[in-house]
A protein has these predicted regions:
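Bacterial N-terminal signal peptides
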Residues: 1-10
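Peripheral, non-catalytic segments that deliver or gate enzyme domains
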Residues: 29-34, 52-57, 73-79, 85-382, ...
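Short beta-strand element of the alpha/beta-hydrolase
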Residues: 394-404
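Boundary at the C-terminal end of the N-terminal hydrophobic targeting segment
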Residues: 9-15, 19
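Beta-propeller domains
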Residues: 47-71
Length: 738
């Protein structure tokens, strides 16, 4: 049945009682439907749904009928699902093994195999533009000719024909008008600012339009032209703290005097919708603690007002028909899974479609509180607190859950991690520490060069607040996070170990220098921003000082690390090197690697496996409740490289030495086998290595092994010799410490 009334009623009747453990499979299994959109003519729905446990593309008639899977990928989930304007095809993206080299695919809704529109090895591609006037074409950005820069291509979705629009010779991005003319481009200058240039239609002459200083770049940007090409819309914090919606006249000198469309003194303008015919803004969203809609076009006022009453939670308009009369509206609740509605603008009535996780309807889910947490220097951190259902919220074990980025933010709404941890008996606090985005330039810039410093102080202040409020038991606090949040975990356990009972690091970097030195090539044009906001490789002492690996000897609390072997952002060597350093010092660590994952765990069986390990880990060190591990770990690809004292029944430890993922035999090379030029290179490399902390050498060895795999035969002897020297240094260090 199309509408899941029976399913919802059954779930509600069988609701999980307060105190019962909600199974991980229910909390972290695939949603039945997500990423819902409506076809241009309003007759069909598209959504992501599982096929044998992997998220694929589906379609279903709006008026009911059987849903049909259009793809059958078994290795990785699809993402970015959307309709082509021709109404006959769906577009989506997919990578391989978590490498984040996403390709653009198309599939016909009538059936047939999906086709890769960007079938190039090692290339990253994404859709930049679509158009009602060109329904069979899209504009794609792709680093096919230079891995650092994205060139622009026009691709026919029916034939697959590619036409180069603009070869990128060093720009961070482009702006196209409605006719797909390249009208704007941007490049970073020596000061870390962004120089925006424009050109007029039919002209090859570029002129400087607006230079955005480095301290404004997180809050000021150009988005795109209106359909007429007379206004260039964007966000600007120039002359103010919070980013406002503005437009510039696209002409010489026009960058100096933007027109403000809407601004708020609470937070940045962070979202909204535009007219699909004119590309003029119709409404904007400002999100401080909760999203607030502000109508710009009075024609939308009745819709927005009615949608605010249609269902619980905060809504967003996720898809619209070509005539803009029918919308797909998603509601985000804190104590229930998201719900999708069909909104008829003519009748001003909504029709419930489905919920993303029907099994969670009626479950005893917790509410999320929006709170302001003070910092020691007088700032306020918009934060989100969840406590167990039925709990008084006092003297609880607590998980400080740190978001990644760090130039991102946490928001109010349904969060499976908050629900899971609260269901196991923990309070969960997610602070938006300085450096988080969305709260104005002063707040984000306060995090500049404060990794391991004031950004970490903010996390400690969050702990202090929770203890002072009587929420958290000071002896039972864990710190957990992914990406930058994982870095914050390592920083917390090395800088302030007395605050935390344990830590969970998910794909977090352990050394800022090795992180910067191994970023994907398409990040390199932006590295000046990293220099200004984090630190420069030209100041190695500072980089060492803000790197947890440097301070590894201070870890005296249990640590769990999860890592994807194919992570292109935070390489596996980041986790390998801190695990090696801890092992050398006899410090306990639980280390889990997933060979088929990247920056995060997207395969549900892998995600559930790692969460099962987290659950046992937290129960052991904080005393919360835990669902038995069962077969969750053995059903995944998890490699338990170090159990760290955990007794994971049925799971075998997979031991990997020296950070190698696969054993590789290396031939022994003597120095006299190398040419004079190669011997000189060895001297230079070894001189550099002599200046590095010994803890970093396993990571360097990993990188040399990766280079060896790609190097031509004539370079093998040189690389083998250097690896041999590294092995000797690592072995000598181990013997000395022993």
């Amino acid at each position: 049945m199309f509408f899941e009334v029976i399913c919802l009623a059954t779930a509600a009747a069988q609701g999980v009682a307060v105190g019962d453990l909600i199974p991980r499979e229910v909390l972290f299994g695939n949603p039945e439907r997500s990423s819902v959109s409506i076809s241009p003519d309003g007759t069909m729905l598209a959504f992501r749904g599982p096929v044998d446990g992997v998220m694929n593309a589906w379609v279903q008639p709006v008026e009911g009928g059987e849903a049909k899977a259009l793809t059958n990928f078994s290795d990785r989930p699809i993402g970015g699902l959307s309709w082509s304007w021709n109404g006959d095809q769906l577009l989506f993206s997919k990578d391989a093994g978590g490498d984040e080299n996403f390709h653009v695919y198309v599939v016909d809704i009538a059936g047939g195999e999906p086709r890769d529109l960007t079938p190039h090895d090692g290339v990253r591609a994404g859709i930049s533009e679509t158009s009602q006037e060109r329904p069979d074409e899209i504009v794609v950005s792709m680093n096919k000719t230079n891995p650092q820069f994205m060139s622009m291509y026009r691709i026919n979705t029916r034939t697959g024909e590619q036409t180069l629009i603009e070869e990128n010779e060093g720009y961070l991005g482009y702006i196209l008008d409605d006719d797909w003319n390249i009208r704007g481009r941007a490049a970073m200058n020596e000061d870390g600012g962004l120089v925006n240039e424009l050109r007029d239609v039919g002209s090859d002459e570029w002129y400087e339009f607006l230079t955005i200083p480095s301290d404004e770049m997180m809050n000021t940007s150009m988005a795109g032209f209106n359909k007429a090409g007379t206004r260039l819309y964007g966000a600007s914090s120039l002359g103010r703290d919070k980013a406002a919606l503005v437009w510039w006249a696209p002409k010489k000198g026009g960058g100096e005097s933007p027109t403000v469309v809407f601004e708020s003194d609470k937070a940045d303008v962070s979202g909204g919708i535009g007219n699909p015919d004119t590309y003029e803004p119709e409404a904007v969203v400002v999100d401080y603690l909760r999203p607030e809609w502000h109508v710009l076009d009075s024609a939308l006022a009745p819709d927005i007002e009615a949608l605010q009453k249609l269902d619980q939670g905060d809504f967003n308009i996720s898809s619209r028909t070509k005539d803009n009369r029918t919308w797909i509206v998603a509601y985000n609740r804190d104590n229930g899974p998201p719900r999708y509605w069909l909104w008829d603008r003519d009748t001003q009535k909504g029709r419930f479609l489905f919920t993303t996780w029907p099994a969670l309807e009626g479950a005893a889910l917790a509410s999320m509180r929006s709170v302001e947490v003070p910092t020691r220097d007088g700032m306020k951190m918009p934060s989100y607190l969840t406590v167990p259902v039925g709990s008084a919220g006092k003297n609880l074990p607590m998980v400080l859950f740190v978001h990644g980025g760090p130039w991102a933010r946490d928001s109010w709404g349904y969060n499976p991690y908050h629900q899971w941890l609260a269901n196991r008996g923990y309070a969960v606090l997610s602070p938006n520490f300085r450096g988080s985005t969305g709260f104005g330039k002063e707040f984000v810039n306060a995090g500049n060069r404060e990794w391991y410093g004031k950004m970490q102080d903010d996390l400690n202040d969050s702990v202090a607040w929770a203890v002072e409020q009587g929420i958290a038991d000071p002896k039972r606090i864990a710190i957990m996070g992914g990406s930058y949040g994982g870095y914050a975990v390592l920083a917390g356990l090395t800088r302030d170990p007395e605050l935390f009972a344990c830590g969970v690091d998910i794909v977090g970097p352990s050394h800022v220098g090795t992180l910067i030195g191994s970023v994907p090539p398409y990040w390199k044009p932006m590295m000046k921003m990293f220099d200004d906001r984090v630190g420069s490789m030209d100041e190695p002492a500072y980089i060492d000082a803000i790197s947890p690996l440097t301070h590894v000897k201070y870890i005296n609390k249990p640590l769990l690390i999860g890592q994807g072997a194919n992570d292109p952002r935070v390489k596996i060597s980041e986790s390998n090197q801190i695990v090696a350093a801890m092992n050398k010092r006899g410090l306990p660590v639980t280390y889990v690697v997933f060979p088929d994952e990247g920056h995060g765990f997207h395969n549900p069986t892998n995600n559930m496996a790692f969460n099962a390990i987290i659950e046992e880990f937290l129960a052991a060190h904080l005393g919360g409740k835990a669902e038995p591990v069962g077969d969750d770990v053995t059903n995944s690809t998890a490699q338990l490289r170090d159990k760290g004292g955990l007794s994971l029944a049925g799971a075998k430890t997979h031991v990997v030495t020296k950070g190698e993922d696969e054993p590789v035999e290396l031939s022994v090379v003597a120095i006299d086998e190398l040419s004079p030029e190669e011997q000189q290179q060895v001297q230079m490399v070894m001189a550099q290595l002599s200046q590095m902390p010994i803890e970093q050498l396993p990571m360097v060895r990993d990188q040399m092994m990766q280079q060896r795999a790609m190097a031509p035969p004539e370079s093998q002897k040189l690389i083998n010799y250097i690896i041999g020297q590294l092995d000797d240094k690592i072995e000598q260090s181990t013997k000395q410490d022993g």
